[in-house]
Regions:
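Short, flexible turn/loop "capping" segments at secondary-structure junctions
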Residues: 16-20, 130-132, 165-166
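Active-site beta-strand/loop microenvironment that shapes enzyme catalytic pockets
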Residues: 78-127
């Protein structure tokens, strides 16, 4: 069964300074290695005069593809710590590039690891992160006498209505997390003794960004 996963929804920029060296983190949502590499190249062109543009990315709903680069920094001091930040935060389909402008003072391997880690974390904190939840779209038709019961049930479960149509009957579309589909079908059957007409219309992912409901047409 498909599982929920976290990703950057809107990437942002963050900067830290360590012994006069500037570390600038840029994050972005990507859905393929090609998109990740294209974004990395964009950042390299933007900061063309920087000494290093180190990067890390995780692609896939279960972080199936993971890559990183130290871009000239000592081995394991930049890309790997940045990748650890992404994996530790559970971020999928995300790329981070940290640009370094050398400040004249050597940081040592330990200092570099701490600086690149801190920059990547600052970038994650500055970005908008969402959790995409696999869901099924229900269409339920009830009578006017039954609509109160249905809306109460949805409120109890914390489900968001997508659309309501009041005609001869009342039709309500709403999303149910995939893991709760069976229990929802059972509760509808018990609550309306089989009189409610229920259809499964679609599958996909949704996320909540504050009060905003985001819908994604992704294969579940």
């Amino acid at each position: 069964m498909s599982e929920a996963y976290k990703t950057v929804y809107i990437g942002d920029t963050a900067e830290i300074v360590e012994k006069k060296s500037r570390f600038i983190a840029n994050l972005e949502h990507v859905e393929s290695e090609e998109e990740a590499l294209a974004y990395i190249e964009t950042i390299r062109k933007k900061y063309w005069d920087a000494r290093h543009n180190c990067y890390a990315y995780c692609i896939g709903k279960k972080q199936e593809l993971k890559r990183c680069s130290d871009d000239g920094e000592p081995s394991q001091t930049a890309g790997k710590p940045m990748l650890d930040v992404l994996t530790g935060a559970g971020l999928c389909d995300t790329v981070v590039v940290v640009t370094r402008y050398f400040g004249g003072t050597l940081l040592g391997t330990g200092g570099l690891v701490r600086a690149y880690t801190a920059a990547a974390k600052a970038g994650v904190e500055a970005s908008e992160v969402i959790e995409k939840i696999p869901a099924v779209q229900f269409l339920v038709k009830v009578t006017y006498n039954q609509i109160g019961t249905l809306l109460y049930l949805l409120g109890q479960r914390g489900y968001s209505q997508l659309e309501s149509e009041y005609a001869e009957d009342v039709s309500v579309r709403f999303l149910v997390p995939l893991t709760e589909r069976a229990s929802m079908e059972k509760q509808l059957l018990e609550s309306f003794q089989g009189s409610a007409k229920t259809e499964i219309e679609d599958y996909g992912y949704y996320a909540k960004n504050g009060k905003e409901l985001l819908l994604f047409e992704e294969e579940v």
